[in-house]
Design a protein with these regions (language model features):
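Interfacial segments of transmembrane alpha-helices in multi-pass membrane proteins
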Residues: 1, 257, 261-276, 280-281, ...
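Hydrophobic alpha-helical transmembrane signal-anchor segments
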Residues: 1-45
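Short extracytoplasmic
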Residues: 31, 38-66
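Non-transmembrane, solvent-exposed regions of membrane trafficking/translocation machinery
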Residues: 55-90, 94-294
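A short beta-strand structural signal in non-transmembrane regions
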Residues: 256-257, 302-308
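A short acidic/small-residue loop/turn micro-motif
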Residues: 296-298
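Juxtamembrane "pre-transmembrane" interface segments
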Residues: 300, 312-355, 360
Length: 395
């Protein structure tokens, strides 16, 4: 009895849970009808995006890093720099005393062994050659693929196709996504989060809009007329985050709470302990979100980011921070909406073919094997329902 009851129950459950995949109502919000087999872009329709990683921005950042390194090396060697020119593929550093150039070049080479350098009179030329560019390119594309995948998964999109296309492009197919605006917003932000100390004392440099060495001037996210003079060196960044989620602050409204890993918690604790009374700016993609004053050490490894957020803004920012920062901005170079007209025809034709095939197989089994053939048909049909229900439930 128990064996029969178990078999009948499994078959009934298979029939019930296969219903969503058989009737396939794509627009239904019913939780039960959502448990259906996920169709691909060609059958279900959706969105097609082709993204291009802006590697030029990455190369420029690398050259800026070289420039900062040269300044530090020159200062350590008491060498005066006349001028630094940052071009598209190289930087040219002019020194007052050419006798110290070799020493500076060797020190720089110890830091960046794979970068090409050459001397011309009192100038040091640092180039990003093709080999170095390829290394940066491959690393950036690989990292971008991983982060795009995380962001898409966080958005709830099922069965996306994400793959590299060519040298610096990423192909993205999103079945069932009719309006990809939110996806585009999530992918359009680099989400590079850093924390910097605010220099409130050097008001003359801020008023003159000239950042001294080791400093940078950054706009407020909500008002371009508000500027901050920040220490250029990031004290801790988004790479140390292990969690972020939308939350609600009683005084500031919607916010994003975050938690650091062990290393980040130690850094953040030291920063807040050493700088009580100073302001700490939270910088996202080159603009200041908030710059609160440190009233007491924060040693628990967690904090909260406040701003003029609504619930969706806070949720999206949390998604971006959890997924991690893109190494370089992404540009949408091609966008298409794929209709499901062909898919609907294919599905309808497939259903008709399946029914005709099933009827013919059942007739053949009954004609050849009689009663045993009929029993085999029942088992076959039950098996089909169970497989469809499992595929729909698993997704």
């Amino acid at each position: 009895i128990w064996k029969s009851f178990t078999v009948i129950s499994l078959v009934l459950l298979g029939i019930i849970f296969s219903i969503p995949s058989i009737i396939y109502n794509d627009d239904s919000d019913n939780w039960f009808l959502k448990n259906k087999i996920n169709l691909g872009l060609d059958l279900q329709g959706g969105s097609y995006l082709l993204l291009e990683v802006q590697l030029d921005v990455l190369y420029q950042e690398e050259l800026e890093n070289f420039s900062d390194s040269i300044r530090l090396i020159a200062r350590d060697n008491s060498a005066k720099i006349n001028q630094i020119i940052v071009n598209e593929n190289d930087i040219i550093v002019s020194f007052e005393d050419k006798n110290k150039i070799n020493e500076i070049k060797n020190s720089f080479f110890q830091m960046y062994r794979s970068v090409s350098t050459q001397l011309e009179d009192n100038k040091l030329i640092i180039k990003i050659d093709d080999m170095y560019k390829k290394t940066i390119q491959d690393s950036a594309i690989k990292q971008s693929l991983e982060i795009v995948r995380k962001r898409i998964d966080e958005s709830g999109t099922k069965e996306p196709l994400i793959q590299r296309s060519g040298k610096k492009r990423i192909l993205l197919q999103l079945p069932g996504v009719k309006d990809p605006e939110r996806i585009k917003e999530l992918l359009g932000k680099t989400a590079k989060l850093t924390f910097h100390l605010v220099d409130d004392e050097n008001t003359s440099a801020l008023n003159a809009n000239i950042a001294p060495f080791g400093k940078m001037i950054v706009n407020d996210i909500y008002d371009d007329n508000i500027k901050y003079l920040l220490n250029k060196r990031s004290l801790v960044g988004g790479e140390n985050l292990v969690d972020a989620k939308g939350s609600f602050d009683q005084t500031e409204g919607h916010a994003v709470s975050f938690r650091f890993d062990t290393e980040g918690a130690q850094k953040f604790g030291k920063i807040t302990s050493d700088n009580v009374g100073n302001r700490l700016a939270v910088v996202l993609d080159g603009v200041v979100i908030t710059a609160p004053r440190i009233n007491s050490p924060i040693t628990g490894g967690s904090g909260i980011i406040t701003g003029n957020f609504n619930a969706q803004d806070a949720s999206d920012l949390a998604v971006l921070l959890r997924a991690g920062a893109l190494p370089a901005p992404l540009e949408i170079v091609e966008e298409r909406s794929v209709g499901a007209g062909l898919g609907a025809d294919s599905i309808a034709a497939g259903k008709i073919a399946a029914v005709i095939g099933m009827v013919l197989v059942c007739l053949f089994m009954i004609l050849i094997y009689g009663v045993f053939g009929a029993l085999a048909n029942v088992s076959l049909i039950a098996n089909i329902f169970i497989i469809i229900s499992l595929l729909g439930t698993i997704g």
